[in-house]
């Protein structure tokens, strides 16, 4: 089987046979088009998700995924019942508040996988100016001794408009998070130290961190980082933070605006923050 816009040239005969079966048997990801993915693409039905779905399944079969794994990825990406409403409230953010794509991340400053994800997510905002917004939510894990203290430090810095400066300092110096270390970072980023320290130790700041944690619990956050893109979980057990995120964002921009997404301004892989190895997945509670 050949479908316009789908490159299957790199597939082996067995892989192409599997892919052909999948796109012939799985329904198009638009309820208004109750036909197979293959028929949807072939007949150019009015479902902008069909061609991306067919291409997603190419990536899945090329990666050696089973039928079950490929279907899980397909439904995670396209099922209409997977989208949740997430209130960003006063959470710190980067990018336009009217961006077509909003990325919400629950993270822990002591989590190595979060440290790895941070520059990748920020790069997405830089690569798509005005189209992507990144929102940070606090979710310190009980297993991390300094996670709660670091989250409070970032909230206290946020109150002085210095959240992202503290965010960067904490991830850059993740191995040094004793109170004296965090106090040094606060001084380095130029906050009013007395006010910052009072806020760092206040109940109001602890409540602010706990509010994000409760919101995370409500959407079943079980580890960090947990990432949602336009209300849909970007499941890091199924999708790679670097290899798949750009395609995901481009499609969401196109679906939201009806216009092709611009190519990123800067090509190339995004380096992990001071990390030589790529972590396998999110930290669990």
PLM features: residue spans?
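N-terminal targeting signals for export/organelle localization
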Residues: 1-2, 17-18, 34-82, 264-285
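Immediate flanking context of iron-sulfur cluster ligation sites
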Residues: 13-28
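Local cysteine-cluster metal-coordination motifs and their immediate loop/turn environment
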Residues: 25-41, 109-113
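C-terminal cap of thioredoxin/glutaredoxin-like
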Residues: 48-49, 106-107, 113-125, 183-285
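A short beta-strand-turn-helix
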Residues: 86-101, 126
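Loop/turn elements at helix/coil->beta-strand transitions in domains of secreted/extracellular proteins
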Residues: 99-102, 129-133, 160-165, 191-194, ...
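Conserved helix-turn-beta segment immediately C-terminal to the redox Cys motif
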Residues: 118-139
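Short, internal strand/loop/helix patches
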Residues: 154-176, 190-197, 204, 210
